[in-house]
UniProtKB/Swiss-Prot annotation:
Full protein name: Phosphatidylinositol 3,4,5-trisphosphate 5-phosphatase 1
Domain comment, as recorded: The SH2 domain interacts with tyrosine phosphorylated forms of proteins.
Pfam families for this protein: C2_SHIP1-2_2nd, C2_SHIP1-2_first, Exo_endo_phos2, SH2
Gene Ontology BP annotations: immune system process; negative regulation of bone resorption; negative regulation of neutrophil differentiation; negative regulation of signal transduction; phosphatidylinositol dephosphorylation; positive regulation of B cell differentiation; regulation of immune response
Family: Belongs to the inositol 1,4,5-trisphosphate 5-phosphatase family.
GO-annotated molecular function: inositol-1,3,4,5-tetrakisphosphate 5-phosphatase activity; phosphatidylinositol-3,4,5-trisphosphate 5-phosphatase activity; phosphatidylinositol-4,5-bisphosphate 5-phosphatase activity; SH3 domain binding
Phosphotyrosine: residues bearing it: Y1007
Localization: Cytoplasm; Cell membrane; Membrane raft; Cytoplasm, Cytoskeleton
PTM remark: Tyrosine phosphorylated by the members of the SRC family after exposure to a diverse array of extracellular stimuli.
Recorded name of the encoding gene: inpp5d
UniProt entry tagged with the keyword NADP: no
Compositional bias per record (Acidic residues), positions renumbered to this chain: 103-116
Superkingdom of source: Eukaryota
UniProt organism field: Xenopus laevis (African clawed frog)
Cellular component aspect of the GO annotation: cytoskeleton; cytosol; membrane raft; plasma membrane
Length: 1019
């Protein structure tokens, strides 16, 4: 479809932006519907409001504009006919169609700078051969038979093809033999074929020349293997060895037979050895157990610091206190007596251990470790001990390893275990934590040259080497050379279900798989996980295209519960991890390359990170909105000289000149979790001894909270009484939407604690002002949970989706945690609304939980706490939500919204992780910049000004953005930070192919069966 007014699958907010920029009543465009497959949406501007009409297709493929009840339907054969009809006045629309909004023309797609041409650009070898035209044999053949011209052409073609191949690994004598065949002897074989012969004597002669060494080795190796096989399997018949030897002639068939025999023998031999080993006495390796580990600490007693030793015996479940390392045990505490570990925030070496004494009283013991890494290792071992001896049948906490590595199209080295042990630079694990294996490993690779089997075998072997655990492959997904592998401990296999995989191409024309993403998702008991491994467009100047890659992946990757498909992708999982070669670069002039190198050598990473494109884009909330990233304390992972980590190669000779690749943090790990879900990043760094690629592997480890399938302790007979079950009530709810649309709204509620989706009635009242619409909802339906136990409900979340009554399209989705900080039954809430990764508004109100029995159980991850320090807290960034809400309160001029924000700030949703943004300092000693006023990745919900738009569009209130001090020198000048809304960003990549794999989505039993009546039928 090539009509200028048809914009394909652009988002609703993008359509509103385009109409706002036009600013004329009667402006219109057509886009794909976001709610109904194979339907369209006609968007019309009238009096600064956007009206959207759904265009449906019936069984006869006729099109019609969805009309109100009682209005006759008009049918059209195509969109052009429909548009021409509604260009007339007074035919049913709010205004007639006058000014089509033409689709933005996209520039030609440039090949990716890292995409190597195929075949490899290897200069041809100078072969010594005699051209066919100079040989008497060929001259004679040409003179005698005109048909030999075809043989000559074939000879030249094959010879040219062979010259274009990479022949660096071929021996000289083999090169000469192949060239002689192509230039001389192939003509003889051609003559044989034309005369009806079934043999190729010259080609067989060539094969035997090339395989002389192979034949000799086969003759020598077979008897040895046969003897070994007899030793392993003595039941073989005595005549076995006499049957194996084959005639010693040099025929091709003989060699093929020997190869077949050798292949069969090696395969059978390996299986027999496995059987012998499995039947032998299985002795579990000591590495599968955690040995007792001793920490040297200082104990504060009455103001006196004394050296002492803490011995952690995970296997026996004891914490032993000793005065000397090799001395006797002075006192020990079983795991049940260790109540709490409290980390000091002000002093990173200090730890308080809360113990239960004999008289059921508590005692606090304060210790100072050698460094913060030792303290963290001690806490992880104690946490492991508590988990091991808790007596719980199901875990409520997992340890997850996330790894990403651009392999650079090179095979990995033999030893990659430092990657999985988090050895290298950055926030790494202490040596004492080496014995703690992770529950789940998620490995993402880019430019991976290995097959799936080769790579998974390598991973399993490496993990077995360091843990002695035979990890189970849960799933793999590969898009060309982008791959994700998920492995888990064998004991977790039955807890993992609903595994999904999918991929999205974002490469050249969005069809080639050279760039894109692969994803995997699954349920772990009652908790949903999603993982995305992406390889985005490269090139420092292609930041906008990378941003578009991100939105395409977010919009078109199909994973998770299919009943949550109306929701933003980031709302479909309790925990979502995004990893890969994101390819965001340092936004600095190429002339600063050497200064950058010096800053890296001096480990002054915090002076470079403010210029990181990903941080800059997240600070403006243009991408990865509400995602988190651990503080980066490791050097840039790209572009190294292969074989070493001592030197960055920041220049590359191209046909157009020298190309600069400044050292950059291309390889990243980010995450987003539901509010009040426990997640803690325990390490984030890169290796420094895996050098086969120009990228360094990056690792991250996470402690993640999970929920189990809940079993109510109440009388099962009570569950039939709905009144006794109790309800979840939402009251005084308002939604503030950043939209110019003129429509009515309703809410859909989704949750694992609800049997089915619940739909509200239309909102009672709404008012708009400057592209912001405040929608007030009256009495909302009471939500009946499947289980009313408070212990169960406090682990649940409520997903809300605000939809248009006219088109059933979403205007924003949010997540509300039912866990609260106090004991009040009724408490306020406020959640940010997003759609397709962009912020679209706020939803605030009050929620009341049923006053049923039960209380919240202490979670194992609550065993380790952080003692807050006010002086430290003041130096750190404010909480992302409170920071965002504070900006909203300042920026918004609407009194109702200010009241809602103030109420939200009284009870913020807390997170376990916080974005870290270092103090901004320029590379040059003369250039200084103040710390940013907002953390990266979070923007207040203030309306955003769109310059050049004659109509006040979505969020066009003329308000100045928060002040930011800029760099004082031109060579470090930033790009303009007063950006437009994300929806108005230039689309610099072609339309993406929408995945058509609905089978990848699954029914989640926690949500009940899919109700097909929720969605209109498609033609």
């Amino acid at each position: 479809m090539s009509y200028g007014w048809y914009h394909g699958n652009i988002t609703r907010s993008k359509a509103e932006d385009l109409l706002s920029q036009a600013g004329k009543d009667g402006s219109y465009l057509v886009r794909d519907s976001e709610s109904v497959c194979r339907a369209y949406a006609l968007c019309v501007l009238n009096q600064n409001c956007v009206h959207t009409y759904r265009i449906l297709q019936n069984a006869e493929h006729q099109l019609s504009v969805q009309a109100s009840e009682g209005v006759p339907m008009r049918f059209f054969t195509n969109l052009v006919e429909l548009i021409e009809f509604y260009r007339r006045e007074n035919v049913g629309l709010v205004t007639h169609l006058q000014y089509p909004i033409e689709k933005e023309e996209e520039g030609p797609e440039e090949p990716d700078e890292e995409q190597e041409p195929a075949p490899p650009n290897v200069p041809p070898r100078n072969f010594a051969f005699t051209p066919p035209s100079e040989t008497k044999e060929c001259q004679t053949a040409i003179e005698r038979a005109p048909a030999a011209n075809a043989s000559l052409l074939l000879s030249e073609t094959l010879l040219q093809r062979f010259q274009d191949t990479d022949s660096r690994c071929i021996p000289e004598e083999h090169l000469q033999a192949i060239c002689d065949y192509f230039s001389l002897h192939i003509v003889s074989d051609c003559d044989m074929v034309r005369t009806g012969s079934q043999t190729l004597p010259q080609f067989k002669k060539l094969l035997m020349t090339l395989c002389t060494g192979l034949h000799r080795e086969l003759t020598r190796t077979l008897p040895t293997l046969e003897s070994l096989q007899v030793a392993i399997d003595p039941q073989l018949s005595p005549g076995f060895k006499q049957r194996s030897p084959l005639p010693g002639d040099s025929a091709t068939n003989n060699m093929v037979n020997k190869l077949t025999h050798l292949t069969s023998m090696v395969s059978n031999l390996e299986e027999k050895v496995k059987t012998v080993l499995m039947e032998g006495a299985a002795v579990k390796h000591r590495r599968s157990l955690i040995p007792p580990i001793i920490f040297e600490v200082k104990a504060d007693s009455i103001g006196i610091s004394q050296k002492t030793h803490l011995k952690v015996d995970v296997e026996t479940g004891k914490l032993i206190i000793k005065k000397s390392k090799d001395g006797p045990d002075d006192k020990f505490y079983p795991s049940k007596k260790i109540l709490q570990l409290i980390k000091s925030q002000k002093f990173p070496h200090k730890l308080v251990i809360v113990l239960e004494t004999e008289k059921e009283k508590t005692q606090r013991k304060e210790y100072v470790f050698a460094d913060s890494k030792k303290r963290e290792g001690f806490c992880q071992l104690l946490q492991q001990m508590k988990n091991k001896h808790s007596g719980q049948s199901e875990p409520d906490m997992l340890s997850i390893f996330i790894g990403t590595w651009n392999m650079g199209d090179a095979p990995p080295p033999k030893n990659i275990t430092p990657w999985f042990q988090c050895k290298g630079q950055g926030k790494t694990r202490d040596d004492t934590a080496d014995y703690i294996e992770h529950d789940i490993y998620v490995i993402g690779t880019q430019e991976d040259p290995l097959s799936e089997k080769e790579w998974t075998d390598t991973l399993i072997h490496s993990l077995r080497e360091i843990t002695s655990v035979e990890y189970k492959v849960i799933t793999t997904q590969t898009l060309w050379n982008i791959r994700i592998v998920v492995l888990a401990k064998p004991e977790h296999a039955h807890r993992i279900s609903h595994v999904c995989t999918n991929s999205v191409k974002t490469g050249i024309a969005n069809t080639l798989g050279n760039k894109g993403a692969v994803g995997a998702s699954f349920m772990f008991n009652g908790t949903s996980f999603g993982f995305i491994n992406s390889h985005l467009t490269s090139g420092s100047e292609k930041k906008l295209r990378r941003n578009q890659n991100y939105f395409n992946i977010l919009r078109f990757l199909v994973l998770g519960d299919k009943k949550l498909s109306p929701f933003n992708f980031t709302h479909r999982f309790n925990h979502l991890f995004w990893l890969g070669d994101l390819n965001y670069r340092l936004q600095l002039p190429n002339t600063e390359a050497e200064n950058i190198i010096q800053k890296i050598k001096q480990q002054q990473h915090q002076e470079l990170l403010p210029h990181d494109q990903l941080n800059l884009e997240r600070r403006e909330s243009l991408i990865f909105f509400q995602f988190h990233e651990e503080e980066i304390t490791f050097p840039p992972t790209y572009r190294y000289e292969r074989g070493s980590r001592e030197r960055y190669c920041y220049t590359k000779q191209k046909a157009t000149g020298i190309k600069y690749n400044l050292p950059s943090w291309c390889d990243r790990i980010l995450w987003k979790s539901y509010p009040q879900m426990h997640i803690l990043c325990q390490s984030y760094g890169c290796t420094d001894d895996i050098t086969t690629s120009d990228h360094s592997p990056v690792f991250g480890t996470f402690q993640v909270g999970v929920t189990s399938q809940f079993v109510s302790k109440n009388n099962p007979g009570d569950s039939g009484d709905l009144e006794a079950q109790g309800h979840i009530e939402l009251m005084n709810c308002k939604a503030t939407l950043y939209t110019k649309s003129h429509t009515k709204f309703y809410i859909e509620f989704h949750s694992p604690c609800l049997e089915n989706m619940v739909k509200s009635s239309e909102a009672e009242d709404q008012e708009g002002n400057n592209g912001t619409l405040v929608v007030k909802f009256g009495v909302l339906p009471k939500l009946t949970p499947i289980i009313s136990d408070l212990e169960y409900l406090l682990d649940q979340h409520l997903l809300i989706c605000i939809k248009s009554s006219d088109t059933d399209e979403s205007y924003g989705e949010g997540c509300i945690a039912l866990r609260k900080e106090d004991t009040e039954q009724q408490f306020p809430f406020c959640t940010i609304l997003t759609h397709h990764g962009e912020e679209t508004g706020l939803f605030c109100g009050e929620i009341c939980l049923p006053a049923s029995g039960g209380k919240q159980r202490e979670k194992l991850y609550d065993f380790v706490k952080i003692e807050k320090d006010e002086t430290v807290a003041q130096k750190q960034l404010k909480h992302p939500y409170s920071q965002s809400m504070e900006q909203s309160r300042i920026m918004k001029s609407i009194s109702e919204k200010s009241a809602m924000i103030a109420r939200m700030r009284a009870a913020p949703e807390t997170q376990n992780s916080m974005d870290h943004t270092a103090s901004v300092a320029a590379i040059s000693s003369q250039a200084k910049q103040s710390p940013p006023t907002t953390p990266p990745g979070f923007r207040g919900s203030e309306p955003r000004q769109k310059p050049g738009s004659p109509v006040q569009g979505r969020g066009d209130t003329p308000i100045t953005s928060p002040p930011r001090t800029t760099l004082s020198t031109q060579k470090f000048s930033h790009s303009n930070t007063n950006r437009t809304a994300p929806a108005a960003r230039p689309q610099d990549s072609l339309q993406i192919t929408v995945p058509s794999d609905p089978h990848e989505m699954v029914d989640n039993p926690l949500y009940g069966p899919v109700n097909n009546t929720l969605y209109p039928p498609t033609a």
